[in-house]
Regions:
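Histidine-centered divalent-metal-coordination microenvironment in nucleic-acid enzymes
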Residues: 17, 132-145, 318-325
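Beta-strand elements of well-folded, non-transmembrane domains
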Residues: 20-22, 60, 144-148, 325-327
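Short alpha-helix boundary/capping segments
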Residues: 66, 162-166, 170, 333-341
Length: 344
């Protein structure tokens, strides 16, 4: 099969986060709407850190048009099932916040899996604060078709590497290229140059300037979300925890090491308080997903698969690019031009 035909079979998926907000522009305090289904089981609409932070998930589809059609359909469904006085916030940086305690942590019910997901998020709040977790973004997922890999391997492979190893090696090469040139994404598509003053309430030292009575900004900024006030692991620089992208084995080993290494600061938080779990553990990373990065190799998960175990056993299924801001000027926060640029 010609390469051009193989590329048309590649799959694209979009995950988009967004806050539910009340009529006065503040973060919604209501439970996850029943009309949106179970946040634990609905594959298309779930929640992220907060009960108010929705996450929309498309299927892996061929081409930008199909993905945008499905993302639009999910948006329309949400609009019809939100409480009457609520809206879906169209930007990455959050709406009016009234302190850490005013950001409700997502509730997934009383099952073991549901409780684990809630405790993990409580741990994020205790470690980094809830305000940072209220930031929303778009994740672009991309996978090459098996036909592409077969054709590509026939052309360039000069070793006896098995097909899984071949795919893993080249997916990791792709992630390294994204890390090397990924600055271009927020430069071209950054859409979070301003932030509500309420977001900065806990930041006593910052270099943002006043835009108006309610807004701060940074001259020439494109993406505050990807900057110092956005997503970060405060322990990374201090503890030297950086994912190693040299190979899939190195990547898995580096994250597992962080998941097994206790952190003194997190030990001070403790595991339980008044009988309630405060975090899953006191290690630098509670789970692999706690490591924030602009790009991650991801496995195809089934059931209750653990990500690192699935990566090790099954290999890389797709690449997740996490540095896209939500564009508030676009109907669903992203358009065909952006998707095709990322695919190229």
């Amino acid at each position: 099969m010609p390469f051009k035909a193989c590329l048309k079979a590649n799959l694209i998926g979009i995950e988009k986060e967004g806050l539910r907000v009340s009529g006065d522009g503040s973060i919604a305090q209501t439970p996850h709407p029943e009309g949106l289904g179970s946040a634990l089981k609905n594959p298309a609409i779930t929640t992220d850190f907060s009960e108010a932070l929705l996450e929309l998930v498309t299927q892996p589809l061929k081409g930008a048009d199909q993905v945008l059609d499905e993302l639009t359909t999910i948006h329309n469904y949400i609009y019809h099932h939100l409480p009457e006085n609520e809206r879906f916030w169209p930007a990455s940086m959050p709406c009016i916040l009234r302190g850490q305690t005013n950001i409700p942590i997502a509730n997934y019910g009383s099952s073991n899996l549901g409780m684990m997901k809630t405790v993990y998020r409580r741990g994020l709040s205790n470690r980094y604060g809830s305000v940072m977790q209220a930031i929303a973004g778009i994740h672009f997922n991309y996978s090459f078709s098996l036909e592409f890999w077969q054709s590509y391997r026939e052309v360039i492979s000069k070793t006896d590497t098995d097909s899984k190893g071949f795919m893993d090696d080249h997916y990791m090469g792709l992630t390294r290229n994204v890390l090397r040139y990924g600055w271009l994404i927020p430069y071209l598509f950054g859409a979070s140059a301003t932030v509500c003053k309420s977001f900065m309430h806990d930041y006593h030292d910052h270099n943002l300037e006043e835009f108006d009575d309610n807004t701060l900004y940074l001259p020439y900024a494109t993406s505050l979300r990807m900057g110092d006030i956005g997503y970060q692991n405060s322990q990374e620089d201090e503890k030297g925890v950086k994912a190693n992208y040299n190979s899939l084995c190195h990547y898995i080993f580096s994250l597992r090491a962080a998941m097994k290494t206790s952190c003194e600061d997190f030990e001070k938080i403790g595991l339980k308080k008044n009988g309630e779990y405060q975090q899953l553990n006191t290690n630098i990373l509670q789970i692999a997903n706690e490591y924030y990065s602009s790009v991650r190799p991801k496995p195809i998960l089934y059931g209750n698969d653990r990500p690192l175990r699935a990566l090790n056993n099954k290999g890389i299924g797709y690449i997740e690019i996490r540095s896209l801001d939500i564009n508030p000027m676009l109907e669903v926060g992203i358009d065909k031009e952006q998707i095709e640029f990322l695919e190229a």
